[in-house]
Amino acid sequence: MCTPDENDYKTSTDPDTSANTNHTLEKKKRKKRKNTNVACVNCSRLHVSCEAKRPCLRCISKGLTATCVDAPRKKSKYLAGIPNRELPMSIQPDLPPRKIMIPIYNNSSNSSLNVNNMGEQQKFTSPQHIVHKAKFLSNAADSEYSILSNIIYQDTLSNKIPIDILYSNTNSTSNSTIGNSSNNSPTGTNTSPEETEMEKIRQLYSEQRANMPPHPYPSSNQNVYSILLGPNSAKIVASQVNLFANHFPLVPVDSADNSLNFKRLLPRDPSEKSSQINWDSSINQYYLNSETVTFPELAIPLKRRKNHLVSVSLESCSPDAANIKSNVGWEHSLRYSTPMEIYTSINAPFSHTPGFHHLLVYLKHRFNQQDLVKMCRSIAEFRPIFIACSVTLTEEDMIFMEQCYQRTLLEYVKFIAQIGTPTCIWRRNGQISYVNEEFEILCGWTREELLNKMTFIVEIMDDESVRDYFKTLSKVAYRDFRGSEKMKVCRLLSPIKGKIIHCCCMWTLKRDVSGLPLMILGNFMPILN
């Protein structure tokens, strides 16, 4: 038998028993830590506890409400290089923290505004929140990064502030004013987040265009948009608004005779029907051109002869039509026809910010919230690549990028004129930059209608093709560097309402010297069966 001393010795040296005992003792010693709040300046100076509410109860009792603000904290390493006067002031609403609400997707604008308001109020209930973005060396890169951030974070006010405004000393008062207005108003700010966003971005790129010469109104000579911009086309044309800085989407029109006579201003022969189809019955072949008969007008004849082999031929054009078409007033398109003019005349970078902004607004009006989130995710993949490629680029580098774009476009235009394939070229923000005559014949939209204003490639696609567009964009531009991708089915919208052109589209991506997507070339071929 074991003596009592031996039993005590065994119990104390048992590893399992000793571990359980130590764990129990640690539990007793360990107590729940209280959540600590950032003390105000007055409480921090006296080393007393404080609360999250501003002004705190102690400052109210002492009459120090005017100076009751958060005490400055030690800056993080990533903020070490930024002076204190340039750091944005934190916005502290006087509202209690609200419960997190799951937004309900709704197409109505009122519900989206309410969701944005809730997101903004929740974002700034944390007193430790610090707004910070990477500082680019180029203003053009700054503004483009800001609009990309705005697309990704739709419910966050801090990410809607462009970086130039964020680091501007003159706007620190406006930032604090936003916070004060949220304190005084029981439901938040008086202006909606979308209005605030549009106002800030409008100020951003209006300054960039201040020194530019005024653009002539695109439709001053020929009224091509009098019926192509929806029900308010006449008002838009009469207002003389700048269609390069403001976006109005193209809208297909009902045509009783399934032709484009409603938009042909100068037919070849006024005594004849401008859309009289030229057809050779002996070989069952149709003849098309960009002025009288286009491919959308063949929808009904092709449907009648769907069981027969049909060929389509393009009528030969005059030698003058093959000349390079440039326009100095079209900043987004080919501006000059010689390399010397490109290198000597382009002295400012092209701003993609207005294009991204208006693209987002257009998608909001056209698609529901669920589709919009998926599209924004595809655009969001561009942001880290944009930071890596352009954070060290200067303003001179961005000017050189635009010169490279114009020089590359000039060479491609010469090549495209020889191959005869319907081709459309657009920038990385989706803005159409160039189309050839074959593309005009295929889709029915003329070159002037597409390039005489801010037009996006997604405007002339149906809904399903737009969804595939952003998926293809993320593949070809951000995931792999093969430089080409194929859309098996791309449905183009024609000016005739209800007439859709089924095509197969091959993408070719061209990058600049820094690796950023420079331009996208789309070759479209119709699917006849």
Swiss-Prot record:
Low complexity bias spans: 174-193
Function: Transcription factor which regulates nonfermentable carbon utilization. Activator of gluconeogenetic genes.
PROSITE patterns cross-referenced by the UniProt entry: PAS, ZN2_CY6_FUNGAL_1, ZN2_CY6_FUNGAL_2
Tree of life domain: Eukaryota
Biased segments, Polar residues type: 14-23
Gene3D superfamilies: PAS domain
Similarity-based family: Belongs to the ERT1/acuK family.
PANTHER family assigned to the protein according to its UniProt record, in alphabetical order: TRANSCRIPTION ACTIVATOR OF GLUCONEOGENESIS ERT1 (PTHR47659:SF1), ZN(II)2CYS6 TRANSCRIPTION FACTOR (EUROFUNG)-RELATED (PTHR47659)
GO cellular component, as recorded: nucleus
Subcellular location: Nucleus
Protein name: Transcription activator of gluconeogenesis
Organism of origin: Saccharomyces cerevisiae (strain JAY291) (Baker's yeast)
